[in-house]
Design a protein with these regions (language model features):
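Histidine-acidic metal/acid-base catalytic patches
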Residues: 1-4, 9-26, 89, 103-104, ...
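Active-site-proximal loop/turn and secondary-structure-junction residues that shape catalytic pockets
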Residues: 9-11, 34-36, 69-72, 113-115, ...
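Active-site acidic/histidine proton-transfer and metal-coordination neighborhood
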Residues: 16-17, 58, 75-180, 190, ...
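Short amphipathic alpha-helices and their capping/turn segments at secondary-structure boundaries
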Residues: 16-23, 42-62, 89-103, 130-139, ...
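Residue-level detector of anion-binding/catalytic polar loops
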Residues: 28-29, 62, 105, 146, ...
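Glycine-rich, proline-tolerant flexible connector loops at the mouths of alpha/beta enzymes
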Residues: 33-53, 111-113, 117
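Short, flexible/disordered intra-domain loops and linkers
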Residues: 38-43, 157, 252-257
Length: 279
């Protein structure tokens, strides 16, 4: 297992300082929100993509994943009309291309409010979503990346694919090589799922993992048993990234202290520091 951290854990102007902290704690990669690349990431200039990728790689931290794919775009919804889905598809294709340009092989599709089905029946919603993600999975496969579906519990305002088993079954139904499963420790805690059982069920389509707490609190502060999660990961032979996902905290809190604390917790529980024993 290798350590990565999402850059939503620090301010946009603190990348250099955060990178130093990550390297000091043995991180092997960074996860990125597209809006941190530029204001309109779906139109990111090639020069900016190259420079942003180089910034992280020069520090020994390749970009391993993208998350918050639809941040700032509440207008892009999966279960609107055909025109709305076309706009959503165009956005996600652009972000898939951005991921490929950044060298990120995984994209985490969470976006709970963009995929609310509301009054739409579940079967109808699944039919729409299967066709939509089958096409996007093909695009992702062609670009050499995986679009990974993240379970979003109802506590996050979601009502479609709210737990890990639903995501696993959905990805299997789509059956597209470019579509993967993403698992999240905070989500599993909220849905009261058994991590060993879920990890065993996820199978070969499982592509990425977030070490998180409910509500994206500081990792180690929310009651998730990360030592038990790590044991489950080792039990299934997980060899991917354990990516820390948490916010930088409310005003008046220190993102540095939060990040230092989380990195210590994750390395102790998962053994993810570079040079530590692998899974």
């Amino acid at each position: 297992m290798r350590l990565a951290v999402s850059n939503i854990a620090w301010p946009a102007d603190a990348d250099a300082e955060a990178a130093t902290m990550l390297v000091a704690h043995g991180a092997a990669g960074v996860e990125v929100a597209p809006a941190r690349v530029c204001d309109r990431p779906w139109e990111a200039p090639h020069e900016r993509v190259v420079a942003y990728r180089r910034f992280w790689e020069d520090r020994g931290l390749p970009i391993v994943a993208l998350q918050a794919l639809l941040f700032g775009r509440p207008d892009l919804v999966l279960f609107g009309d055909a025109a709305a889905r076309r706009l959503l598809r165009e956005q996600l294709v652009a972000i898939i291309n951005l991921a490929a340009g950044l060298g990120a092989q995984r994209l985490v599709f969470g976006s709970p409010k963009n995929r609310r089905r509301g009054s739409l029946g579940r079967l109808q919603a699944e039919t729409i979503a299967v066709a939509f993600f089958r096409e996007l999975g093909s695009v992702a496969a062609d670009r050499g990346v995986w679009l990974c579906i993240e379970p979003n519990p109802v506590e996050y305002g979601c009502d479609f694919l709210v737990d890990s088993r639903e995501v696993i079954e959905f990805v299997e139904r789509v059956g597209q090589d470019g579509l993967g499963v993403h698992l999240d420790s905070g989500a599993m805690a909220l849905t009261a799922e058994s991590p060993p059982a879920i990890m065993a069920a996820a199978g070969p389509r499982w592509r990425h993992f977030h070490a998180s707490e409910p509500g994206l609190a500081v990792v180690g502060s929310g009651g998730v048993d990360h030592a038990a999660i790590a044991t489950a990961l080792r039990g299934v032979g997980y060899e991917g990234y354990v990516s820390v996902e948490m916010t930088q905290g409310p005003a008046g809190t220190s993102w540095r202290e939060r990040l230092e604390s989380a990195l210590a917790v994750v390395n102790a529980a998962y053994g993810t520091a570079r040079g530590a024993c692998a899974a």
